[in-house]
Amino acid sequence: MGSKKKCFDGSRDGISGLPDAMICHILSFLPTKVAASTTVLAKRWKPLLAFMPNLDFDESFRFDPRMTCEERRKGSESFMLVVDSVLALQAEANATLNKFYVKCEGVEQNSVLEWIPKVLKRGVLDIDLQIPSSRGFGSNSTFYPLPSEIFVSKTLVRLKIQFQDGANVNVEGDVSLPMLKTLHLDYVKMDTRMLQKLLSGCHTLEELLLMNLIWKESSEPEPCFVSVSVRTLKILKFSRFENFMKAKDFKPIVLLSFDIPNLVYLEYLDTIADKYEQVRFDSLVKASIGLCKTSKQIENDNNNVTKLFMGICNVTILYLTEDTLKVLGCCRETMPVFENLIHLTIRTGVHIGWKSLPHLLKNCPNLQTLVFEGMHHIYRKGRACGDVDEDGTCMCKNLDNMRVKKDIDACLSSSPVKVIKILNFGELCGFCEFCDVEEDVAGQIKQVKQFLETMPDLEKVILYYNTPEDEDVMKVFKKLKKLPRVASAKCEVQIISDNINLSFTFR
């Protein structure tokens, strides 16, 4: 076991007297590079590195923006040497490995990929690799292929790969990941057939994140059929790379199918599919939807996402982006009823109108909380509404059409909403030619007044005012307090800013 040593002050060194297994357990709680450096203090500990079950290499916090390129290069080389040394030590001992975590800037991605087969041979359960880009994701990305061994592991339970220089997923044979429960792939390129192969080999998958995904458009069939059908899946996050979504078009016709009866949480950000073949989310509780149109779909303007929203209409919590609000305008007459929805959050945008919002609120008979991220879309100098190029109504009191106003007020007066929260109240649109502080804030106040004057069940309205000026807060406070009438018999209005918190109650 080795003799017990005394520290320089005469006290006993309790750690050195512990059994090897206990010391190894203690070292496993340290970042691996730190654990390796402790061998300078006690040579007896060095062999124990071979049996550490969790390897944690996080060097990201060590890179100072003020470092020179040469200092960064030397730091990266030193980091890679430490990882190589520890992996070699563990390979020699043929020890089992639970977790392999790497996060470092400035490391060549292909070098990191070479570590994957080494840890797979050790029966690793958890791989987490996060390598920020040195060039920026996009056209300059290298898209190194992920090693094929990673897709036939019999031990992997969790796999997370985030290479911001991009990674390529392409496996010749079958995929077999019988133990995999969590799969995160961020900044990856693959074709839809590879996605089908990947999902078919994950029979116990519970959490799937495919973020910043790029389809290999040139290799896609026509039409392109994408089916996500994993019975065990509970969490799904799917988004395509933002710049790719803004490109001209995804050329093949896309037919999309979701058959995930046990899914609880969905985050879906994409362009609208040409057709939703099947949408089945029987157990869905919370969803975040971000849909936008391709240039071709904007020209045709005949896209209908009714089937998709029919599939998620049983949610209790829903988040919609501003583009999704615009897309919903295509199915105002066929919008499903969200019977279970109690919490709705809407992100607003300066170019997006609210013409679909009255229809949406009308179809939420049990909605309790309504949250707006910003109050954008109207109040821009020389313009009446953010939907200037579209027909239809917008939930806006600036409209002179009394019939339209009557319809909107009728919709709001039947809403059961009890709480309205407005985040970033007072935030300007950000376009210099349209920005007018007084006009923007006055318009946002007018919208809040409309809620107060027409919604009878309101119990609380909270404005999170985006201003450091207390005087601005006081102005809004006084204007709202002077309202001659409100629809609710008892409604509290609260204004929260950086410095003060004001509230009053209508009685």
Curated annotation (Swiss-Prot):
Residues 12-60 form the F-box domain. Coiled coil: none annotated. InterPro entries: F-box-like_dom_sf, F-box_AtFBL13-like, FBD, FBL60-like, LRR_dom_sf, LRR_FXL15/At3g58940/PEG3-like. The keyword Hydrolase does not apply. It comes from the Eukaryota. It holds the Pfam family LRR_At5g56370. CDD domains: F-box_AtFBL13-like (cd22160). LRR repeats lie at residues 135-163, 187-212, 214-240, 317-348, 349-374. Keywords: Leucine-rich repeat, Repeat. The keyword Methyltransferase does not apply. This is Putative F-box/LRR-repeat protein At4g00320. It comes from Arabidopsis thaliana (Mouse-ear cress).
